[in-house]
C-alpha cells in the first residue's frame, strides 16, 4: 500500500492510472503523456513543464473573466470561513438569496424565480422536470414531450441526454427518457432550403418546430429547448426573426420556451443573457459555466413568475433538488464574478470587439480547408471541408486521421488550446476569455493558419 499522503512526481502517469477523464478515449494515453495544466493567468494556461498556451476555449466555455482572478479566490476563502455549506432545502442563506435576486434583475421579462443547480446539465434536467410538473399542476398531464434541434448538446443526465440531438452520444445509454423529439437546426451553411435568404431560412427552420408540435399533438408537448447560438455542430447563430417566430409558435400552442444558455450566458455573446441580444423572452433560462467564471461550480434554472405560480399555491412542491445547488461558496463567487463584469464592463468589451474577432478569423477563408466561419460575440466555429465549391466534408477515415490524429494535438503543440470537434461536420471551435483583445485574435489566427495549412497537406 502506497503512502496516502505522498505526492506523485509523475502526474501524467498517475492521471492515466487513476483519473478517469471525461469524454476521453483513455487508450490514447496508455503510452502517451496526459496533458496536465497547472496554472492560469489572464488568457493563458501553463502546463506542468512550464509551457504557455492561449486558452482559446475559456477552459470549456467557462473562464469568462479570465484566469488568475485573485479576488474570486479570496471571496471563496472568506465565505468558506463564514459558512462553508448549508442546503437551500427549506432554508436560505444570504449569498444564495443575493445571487438569486441579482440573476432575476438581469433576466428579461418576469423571469424572477431562480432554482440553483451545480451545473448546466442539471439545469436542463431541472427545466424539463419543472415543465412536466407544471402542466400536471395545470390539469394537462399529457403535456410532457420536448422538442430540440438536431446535433444540439444539452447535457449528460438521462433527461438532458434525451434532449440532446447527437445519436452517437446517446446510443450507449438507451433506452433514455421518452418524449424528446428533434427538428432541424439553423446551420444556414448547409441549409436544405433558402440558403441564400437568411430570413426565409429562419422562418422555415422555426416553422419546423410548429410542424413537429402539430405532428405530436399540442396537447402532448410541454417545452422547446433551444440554445441562442447552437454549440455542437459548430456555432449556429439564429437567422433574423427566428426566435420571434418560435416565441409566437410556443404561445399559440401553450408550449414553454426554454433558452439553454449554459454556454451563451454571462457575456459570451456580449449580454448577460443571450436571449436579450436576439430580442426574445423565454419562459425559462438554463445557465451555469460563466456564472462564476469557473472559480466554483454552480448552475441555475431561471423561471418566469407565470410558470412558478402554481408551485407557490397550497400544498404544491417542486419535488426536485440537489445537495450542492446554491452552495454558499459558489454563490459568493458568482456575486463577485458579476461585480467584475460590471466594474470592467466585460459585456460591452465583447460587443465592441466581436466584429474584430470575426474579421480576423475570416482571413482564414483564403485557406482551401476552411469552408465557413460563423458565430457571434466571442463564440465562433470554423467548419473544415475538402472542397470549398461543393462543401464536401471529411470521410470518417479522414476525420479520424486529420481531426483526431493530427489537428487537435497540433493546435495544442503550437500553443493554442481549443476544440477540434466532429459532432456534426468537422469544426474548430473558439471561445476565448472575454478579456481577449486584438492581440489575442491575431495569435489565434496565426496558429490556426499554420496548423490548418499542414492539415490540408495531410488530406
Task: Label every PLM stretch briefly.
Residues 2-459:
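Conserved N-terminal phosphate-binding loop of PLP-dependent enzymes in the Aspartate aminotransferase
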Amino acid at each position: 500500500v502506497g503512502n496516502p499522503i505522498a505526492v506523485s512526481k509523475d502526474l501524467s502517469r498517475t492521471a492515466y492510472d487513476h483519473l478517469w477523464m471525461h469524454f476521453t478515449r483513455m487508450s490514447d494515453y496508455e503510452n502517451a503523456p496526459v496533458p496536465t495544466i497547472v496554472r492560469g493567468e489572464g488568457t493563458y494556461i501553463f502546463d506542468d513543464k512550464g509551457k504557455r498556451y492561449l486558452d482559446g476555449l475559456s477552459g470549456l466555455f467557462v473562464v469568462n473573466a479570465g484566469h488568475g482572478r485573485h479576488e474570486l479566490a479570496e471571496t471563496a476563502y472568506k465565505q468558506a470561513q463564514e459558512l462553508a455549506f448549508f442546503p437551500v432545502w427549506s432554508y436560505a442563506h444570504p449569498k444564495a438569496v443575493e445571487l438569486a435576486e441579482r440573476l432575476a434583475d438581469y433576466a428579461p421579462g418576469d423571469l424572477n424565480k431562480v432554482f440553483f443547480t451545480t451545473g448546466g446539465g442539471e439545469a436542463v434536467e431541472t427545466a424539463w422536470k419543472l415543465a412536466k410538473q407544471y402542466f400536471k399542476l395545470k390539469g394537462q398531464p399529457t403535456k410532457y414531450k420536448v422538442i430540440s434541434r438536431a446535433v444540439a448538446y444539452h447535457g449528460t443526465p438521462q433527461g438532458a441526454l434525451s434532449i440532446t440531438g447527437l445519436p452517437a452520444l446517446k446510443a450507449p445509454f438507451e433506452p433514455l427518457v421518452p418524449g424528446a423529439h428533434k427538428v432541424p437546426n439553423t446551420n444556414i451553411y448547409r441549409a436544405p432550403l433558402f440558403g441564400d435568404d437568411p430570413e426565409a431560412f429562419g422562418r422555415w427552420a422555426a416553422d419546423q418546430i410548429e410542424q413537429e408540435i402539430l405532428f405530436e399533438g399540442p396537447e402532448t408537448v410541454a417545452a422547446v429547448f433551444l440554445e441562442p447560438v447552437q454549440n455542437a455542430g459548430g456555432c449556429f447563430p439564429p437567422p433574423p426573426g427566428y426566435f420571434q417566430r418560435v416565441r409566437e409558435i410556443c404561445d399559440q400552442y401553450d408550449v414553454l420556451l426554454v433558452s439553454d444558455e449554459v454556454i451563451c450566458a454571462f457575456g459570451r455573446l456580449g449580454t448577460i443573457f443571450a436571449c436579450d441580444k436576439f430580442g426574445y423572452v423565454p419562459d425559462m433560462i438554463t445557465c451555469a459555466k460563466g456564472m462564476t467564471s469557473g472559480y466554483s461550480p454552480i448552475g441555475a434554472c431561471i423561471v418566469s413568475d407565470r410558470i412558478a405560480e402554481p408551485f407557490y399555491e397550497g400544498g404544491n412542491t417542486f419535488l426536485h433538488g440537489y445537495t450542492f445547488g446554491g452552495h454558499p461558496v459558489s454563490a459568493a463567487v458568482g456575486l463577485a464574478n458579476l461585480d467584475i463584469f460590471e466594474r470592467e464592463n466585460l459585456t460591452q468589451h465583447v460587443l465592441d470587439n466581436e466584429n474584430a474577432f470575426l474579421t480576423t478569423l475570416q482571413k482564414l477563408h483564403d485557406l482551401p480547408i476552411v469552408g465557413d466561419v460563423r458565430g457571434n460575440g466571442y463564440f465562433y466555429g470554423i467548419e473544415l471541408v475538402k472542397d470549398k465549391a461543393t462543401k464536401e466534408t471529411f470521410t470518417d477515415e479522414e476525420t479520424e486521421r486529420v481531426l483526431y490524429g493530427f489537428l487537435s494535438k497540433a493546435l495544442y503543440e503550437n500553443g493554442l488550446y481549443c476544440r477540434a470537434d466532429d459532432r456534426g461536420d468537422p469544426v474548430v471551435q473558439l471561445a476565448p476569455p472575454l478579456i481577449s483583445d486584438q492581440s489575442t485574435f491575431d495569435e489565434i489566427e496565426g496558429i490556426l493558419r499554420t496548423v490548418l495549412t499542414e492539415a490540408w497537406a495531410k488530406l
